[in-house]
């Protein structure tokens, strides 16, 4: 669903920000 996809993208973005 869109909500699940949004949560995954949000999580990926947060992880990416932490790794930088």
Curated annotation (Swiss-Prot):
Alphabetic keyword roster: Cytolysis, Ion transport, Membrane, Nematocyst, Secreted, Target cell membrane, Target membrane, Toxin, Transmembrane, Transport
Instruction: Give a GO cellular-component term.
Output: nematocyst
The alphabetized list of GO BP terms reads:
killing of cells of another organism; monoatomic ion transport
The Swiss-Prot or TrEMBL record annotates one GO molecular function as:
toxin activity
Query: Main localisation, per the record?
Result: secreted
Functionally, this protein is described as follows: Pore-forming protein that forms cations-selective hydrophilic pores of around 1 nm and causes cardiac stimulation and cytolysis. Pore formation is a multi-step process that involves specific recognition of membrane sphingomyelin (but neither cholesterol nor phosphatidylcholine) using aromatic rich region and adjacent phosphocholine (POC) binding site, firm binding to the membrane (mainly driven by hydrophobic interactions) accompanied by the transfer of the N-terminal region to the lipid-water interface and finally pore formation after oligomerization of monomers.
**Family, per entry:** Belongs to the actinoporin family. Sea anemone subfamily.
Domain text from the record?
Composed of a long N-terminal alpha-helix and a core region rich in beta-sheet structures. Before the pore formation, the alpha-helix binds the lipid membrane, partitions into the lipid-water interface and stabilizes the monomeric molecule on the membrane. Finally, it traverses the bilayer, thus forming the transmembrane pore.
Q: What is this protein called?
A: Equinatoxin-3
Please give the organism. Actinia equina (Beadlet anemone)
């Amino acid at each position: 669903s869109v909500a699940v996809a949004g949560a995954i993208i949000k999580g990926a973005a947060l992880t990416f920000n932490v790794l930088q």
